[in-house]
Amino acid sequence: MAEKMTLKDVEFQEKLNTGTSKTNNESFEKNGYLVVKDLWNPDELYRENTNEEGQKNYWGKREDQFKLIPKEMQVEGSHSSYWHPQYRSIHSQIRLKLEKIIGKKLYNTYYYDRFYYPGQALTIHADRPACEISVSVHISDNVKERWPLWIKTPYGENHSVKLDPGDGMLYKGCERPHWRDPLPKEYRRTWYGIKVEKKGLYYHQVFFHYVLADGVRSHFAGDSCK
């Protein structure tokens, strides 16, 4: 989760933060991201799409313990959840897997899942300090083709990453600009040959965020300085 940024803001943050989140994984250091196949069982992450809009900020362990914000702050018209109870223990379990991959100890900060709908995009941005080491996990979708997540590498190339359900893209959230182009709309023909937009399409993913235990952002553990 990040506030919308201008391109100038993104460029400034990239220049300011590049090289500040060192790990022991050579490929991760070179590219600023890493695809982790089969990171988690997508069935354990699945939640039914209800075609809602807005943002639910959870404060308790029950699914009815949340505050609803009618307008999602980053992707207008989407439906997102901050600290949904279903993912609470998974957040820590995934952290243990990522620590082995990067060779560094991590602290949990927060997690955030979002249902995107056709026509919606994630504008280019770099993340706030609590998202130093992050992973975006594809949960489920019912669209025709895999929808890519884009990321800019430290050497200036824009890479397109397509994930299967359960796969994750591990990335340096504060350092590497990332985005999604609009989720394509799909159409069907009626009995009369009229082209109409398909309804009920979605793409669901979850971000799990962490900070390096020995890094300059360690005090953001638990998302305590948001």
Where are these regions (language model features)?
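Non-heme Fe(II)/2-oxoglutarate
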Residues: 1-102
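A structural signal for short, well-ordered beta-strand segments and their strand-loop junctions
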Residues: 35-37, 107-109, 170-171, 207
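Conserved double-stranded beta-helix
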Residues: 74, 80, 91-148
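Intrinsically disordered, low-complexity domain-flanking/linker segments in eukaryotic proteins
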Residues: 187-195
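Catalytic core of non-heme Fe(II) oxygenases with the double-stranded beta-helix
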Residues: 118-176, 193, 200-206, 211-225
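A short, polar/charged loop/turn motif at coil->beta-strand junctions and beta-hairpin connectors
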Residues: 27-30, 107, 202
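Active-site loop architecture of trypsin-fold serine endopeptidases
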Residues: 183, 195-198
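Short, Lys/Arg- and Gly-enriched loop/turn segments at beta-strand edges
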Residues: 177-186
